[in-house]
Amino acid sequence: VNKNALDTAWVEAQLRDARWHTSSLSSGGTNCVQVAFLERGVVALRDSKNLDKPPHLFTDAEYDAFIGGIERGELRRPER
């Protein structure tokens, strides 16, 4: 899927009807990253404290690479 070529109306409809997931490790706080799995292999990520901002859209492959990087520790903050 070419996420840059997606129809805006389709994306808006998908986001309006999206089922957003929050990690069980977030303790129900308001500083959470939320994910929604849309049709056509599109994944949306948003910040629960900034719901007025549009979410970031990823392909399934991009999302899998992102999660893989987290799991491998590749996205840790560098030592200061």
What role is predicted for each listed range?
Residues 7-10, 15-18, 48, 52-54, ...:
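Post-signal peptide N-terminal regions of Sec-secreted extracellular proteins
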Residues 1-32:
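N-terminal first-folded block
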Residues 23-68, 80:
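A short, structured beta-strand/loop element
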